[in-house]
Amino acid sequence: MQDESRCSHLLVALGVAVALACRALPWLLQPQLALDDGAFFFAQNYSEFQWGAIFRPYAGYVPVGTNLSALLLCRLPIAWIPVAFVLAAMVMMFGCARTLLRPAWEQVAPYRIRVAMAYGLVVIPFGSNLEFTSLAYAQWPQMLWLFLLLMEPLRATGRRRRHELGRCGLVVFLAIANPLSVLLAPLGL
């Protein structure tokens, strides 16, 4: 399609990233660990590095992806950790929005509609900004991202095999990393 040039994709992705950064600006300018990011994920992972920490339960479930992210991010210098936690949460929401721009979705909706949906995902206010700025709430963008990847139409041509393998790897990671995938996977399949 004419609208879907590589330059257009890059500009839209950049615009989505800027919109997401504007939304998270207060947390980026005055970094602090939100809620359980500090009380649980930072406190449990900063003092020592233990791979077993990725299986530590939180709020009645085991968020493997969040635990792994916190474990790795807590190896950074202490002043960078709050910003790194916010950026990790932002990357997950950016992944959701970016998935809608992939060429496979042209079978579902025109490019302009998908661009509007991607911007809407990062601009429309949810209950709070915690979904965009807190690792403790990262299961929600992870769940949405997994759902979008599972619902993504398969491409008719085989020339993008590496892309499909990467997509499958991301689906497997998100399914393992997110405890809510047990509820979501049957809906997407």
Regions found by a protein language model. Give the residues of each.
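Membrane-interface alpha helices of multi-pass inner-membrane proteins
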Residues: H163-L187
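Membrane-proximal lumenal/periplasmic loop motifs of glycosylation machinery
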Residues: P26-A34, S47-R75, A79-A89
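Juxtamembrane "helix-exit" motif on the non-cytosolic side of transmembrane helices
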Residues: P26, L73, T99-W105, V123-S134
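Membrane-interface micro-motifs in multi-pass membrane enzymes
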Residues: M92, A109-R155, I176-A177
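Membrane-interface junctions at the ends of membrane-embedded or membrane-associated helices
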Residues: M1-R6, P153-G166, L189
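Transmembrane-helix motifs of polytopic, lipid-linked glycan transferases
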Residues: L87-P110
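Transmembrane signal-anchor helices characteristic of membrane glycosylation enzymes that use polyprenol
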Residues: R6-L33
